[in-house]
């Protein structure tokens, strides 16, 4: 099994914070979001390699991060050569790009590089193995109050981000 981490977005909604830093490399406490994700992937013995697909703008930053990775997996950063939102490939395009350039002919665990989660991927992969079927991992938000937005001292009762889609990757 191979793992593809999607990291080719430009995170424009978080500007200026992410204007010169990819979202996955932002630190939460003493770890980057990407470290939190790779820690979870490292627990999955089935995963042999991690491919991080990114863009031209952030490629060198991911390469630098990769040099400091101390986990058990082989990690490779792949540049999709896009330079802006206007010419980006999108998630499916980037996945195809990695499959084609790396000649992957194996099961693939596809994940966003910037989603934080606290569950083990091992049970998810075990379920995939037992069902022998493609799987998508989703998470129900029980307490939507945790996702309210505070704006200028006023509480906004509902903040909807990507309204219809309440899915947390990874998926196989």
Language-model features: where?
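N-proximal low-complexity "stem/linker" segments adjacent to membrane-targeting elements
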Residues: 1-18, 25
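Conserved N-terminal catalytic core of the sugar/cofactor nucleotidyltransferase
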Residues: 2-5, 13, 31-110, 116, ...
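Glycine-rich, phosphate-binding/catalytic loops in enzymes
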Residues: 20-24, 68-70, 125-129
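Short catalytic helix/loop segments, enriched in acidic residues and glycine
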Residues: 20-36
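A short acidic, glycine-rich active-site loop
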Residues: 23-27, 82-86, 171
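Residues at the C-termini of beta-strands that transition into short coil/loop
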Residues: 29, 79-81, 139, 165
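Conserved core of the sugar-phosphate nucleotidyltransferase
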Residues: 118-172
């Amino acid at each position: 099994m191979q793992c593809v981490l999607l990291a080719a977005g430009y995170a424009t909604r978080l500007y200026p914070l992410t204007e010169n830093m990819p979202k996955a490399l932002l630190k939460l406490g003493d770890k980057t979001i990407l470290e939190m994700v790779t820690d979870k992937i490292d627990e999955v013995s089935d995963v042999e390699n991690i491919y991080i697909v990114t863009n031209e703008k952030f490629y060198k930053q991911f390469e630098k991060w990769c040099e400091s990775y101390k986990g058990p997996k082989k990690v490779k950063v792949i540049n999709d050569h896009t330079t802006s939102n206007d010419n980006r490939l999108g998630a499916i395009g980037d996945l195809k790009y990695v499959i084609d350039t790396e000649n992957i002919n194996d099961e693939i665990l596809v994940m966003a590089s910037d989603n934080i989660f606290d569950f083990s991927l091992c049970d998810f992969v075990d379920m995939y193995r037992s069902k022998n079927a493609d799987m998508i991992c989703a998470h129900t938000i029980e307490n939507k109050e945790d996702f309210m937005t505070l704006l200028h001292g006023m509480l906004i009762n509902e903040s909807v981000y990507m309204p219809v889609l309440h899915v947390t990757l990874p998926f196989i």
